[in-house]
């Protein structure tokens, strides 16, 4: 009976903690995007004491006259040393082309260093991160074209790491997931190269976060879980030049009439995320069009969970799916 009492007390305590956490989340979940303030908050992540231990090299790829910075993260010391050895062959190496999130408006490679370094370490693959141009200074499709130019250089062997195209995987979170999905559609349409695999982590695939949205998660999860529907609407308004942009499938991949001939796709969504349903719906459309697709919903997770520490259960669960997918296994 003592055990039952302590178990009941524990349940009450957990409920109180959950209610307190929910109140804090709700208080932090405000609408409106103040570009400068949001960028300043994002930039605080650069103060990372682990930075000096990351094995990385900076390069540039040109999009016309614009130099697109990229950063290569190495999975271990050996691969880092080999990068300086001109006789070393990287063709059999594997590589993730990473596109960061941030609503097309904030974030940078610097802010995502920990995530990229961890991605290289946890998968054993090279990671190449793209510093694409941000809105509102550079609106759609500037950032996407930067990502396309970098992908084209990698897939056509015009990059410092000459990796076989079939060994390259696109990966992005949130707005980065949107850019990866759009990049795959663009690659199919332009015919210059074609990604074999893509990993979309809680991607944005639609163009409306008002009450008109057809996706229930926008209403269910749009006010109390940090990323609000109001913020998402602000982000897409900052990213688009006009209303016409918002109807472009490269802006909102879910709107593409034809989603056939797309890469093998892994989609990870968060349970408490306004973007949950549109990410899963895009996956279902890809599957119906004959593509190989895996969709996994991370139970209990909020949008942005992938930035949590490597020991976090949601992150570990994600890497289980990611590594199985990269090895061609289904879970």
Q: Where in this protein do the model-derived segments appear?
A:
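Residue-level recognition of short loop/turn positions
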Residues: 8, 64-65
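Single conserved hydrophobic/aromatic residue that forms the stacking wall/gate
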Residues: 1-9, 13
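Positively charged, low-complexity intrinsically disordered regions
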Residues: 6, 24, 40, 47, ...
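Alpha/beta-hydrolase superfamily serine-hydrolase fold, recognizing
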Residues: 54-60, 66-331
């Amino acid at each position: 009976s003592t055990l039952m009492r302590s178990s009941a007390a524990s349940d009450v305590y957990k409920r109180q903690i959950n209610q307190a956490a929910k109140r804090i989340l709700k208080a932090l979940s405000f609408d409106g995007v103040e570009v400068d303030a949001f960028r300043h908050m994002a930039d605080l992540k650069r103060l990372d004491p682990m930075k000096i231990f990351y094995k990385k090299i900076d390069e540039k790829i040109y999009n016309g006259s614009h130099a697109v910075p990229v950063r290569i993260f190495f999975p271990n010391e050996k691969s880092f040393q080999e990068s300086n050895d001109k006789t070393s062959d990287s063709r059999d190496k594997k590589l993730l082309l990473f596109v960061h999130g941030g609503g097309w408006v904030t974030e940078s490679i610097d802010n995502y260093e920990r995530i990229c370094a961890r991605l290289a370490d946890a998968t054993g693959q090279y990671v190449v991160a793209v510093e694409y141009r941000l809105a509102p200074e550079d609106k759609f499709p500037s950032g996407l074209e930067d990502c396309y130019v970098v992908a084209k250089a990698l897939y056509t062997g015009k990059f410092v790491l000459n990796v076989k195209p079939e060994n390259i995987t696109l990966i992005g979170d949130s707005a980065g997931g949107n850019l990866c999905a759009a990049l795959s559609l663009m690659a199919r349409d332009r015919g210059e190269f074609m990604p074999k695999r893509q990993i979309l982590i809680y991607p944005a695939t639609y163009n409306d976060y008002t009450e008109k949205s057809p996706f229930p998660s926008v209403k269910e999860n749009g006010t109390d879980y940090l990323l609000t529907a109001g913020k998402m609407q602000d982000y897409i308004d900052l990213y688009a030049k006009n209303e016409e942009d918002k109807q472009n499938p490269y802006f909102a991949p879910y709107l593409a009439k034809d989603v056939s001939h797309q890469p093998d796709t892994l989609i990870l969504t968060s349970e408490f995320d306004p973007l949950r349903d549109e990410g899963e719906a895009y996956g279902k459309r890809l599957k119906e069009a004959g593509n190989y697709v895996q969709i996994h919903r991370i139970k209990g997770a909020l949008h942005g969970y992938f930035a949590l520490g490597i020991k976090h259960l949601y992150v570990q669960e994600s890497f289980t799916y990611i590594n199985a997918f990269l090895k061609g296994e289904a879970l």
